[in-house]
Amino acid sequence: MRNFLILLATVGLSTSACAQSTPATEGPEVPSDPPYIVLSANQDEPNGYGFCMDTYGAGQSDLMQTHSCKPSKDDEPRDYAGNDTRFEYSEATQQVMSYPFEGYCMQALIASEVTVFALLECSDHPRQKFVYSAEDKSLRLAEDQSRCVTVASETVPAGPWVKRPLNLETCDDIAPSLKQWTIATE
C-alpha cells in the first residue's frame, strides 16, 4: 500500500510539473504548414498545438469555431478536408479566407445578443471585413473596431481534440489571451 501511495504521489508530482511547464500564455507549436490563424496563447490545448480558426465539424461547414490545430499530411491537396483549420488573412481585402475551400470567407452573423461566425462565399459584405493589428494582435470587425474576434474561456472536448467557440466581444472587456491572434502566411 505504501509503495502504491508513493507511486501515486510521484505521478501526481510529474503531472503537476508538466502542467506548470506549459503555461496558458506560452505560444503554441502549430503542427501544420501555413497559412493558419492561431490564438497566440496556447491556453489549455493538451498537445501544445494551439487553437486555430476552423470550420465546425469535419471538412467544409457553414459555421466556424476554434479547434486544436491539426497536423499537416505530406502531399495533401489544397482542398483536402483535413485542412479545415487553415485560414489566411488578406490585408488588401480585409477578409479571413478559407485555405482549402477557396472563395469562402469568415462572416460575422450578428443578431440581438448573439453572434456566430459563418463560412460563406466571399463578398463585399461589411461583416466579412476585419482589421488585423500586428501591434496588439487583435482582429477587429472593420465596421465597428471596438469589437474583436475572441474565443470562449472554456475548452470543450471534440473527439481526440478540443475546441472553443468564436465570439465577437467588446475588445476592452476581454483578456488579451482570449483575443490575440497570430497570422502565419505561406
Residue positions per predicted region:
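Sec-dependent N-terminal signal peptides
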Residues: F4-L13
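C-terminal motif of bacterial Sec signal peptides marking the signal peptidase cleavage site
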Residues: T15-A17
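Lectin-like carbohydrate-binding module/patch detector with strong preference for beta-trefoil
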Residues: Q20-E186
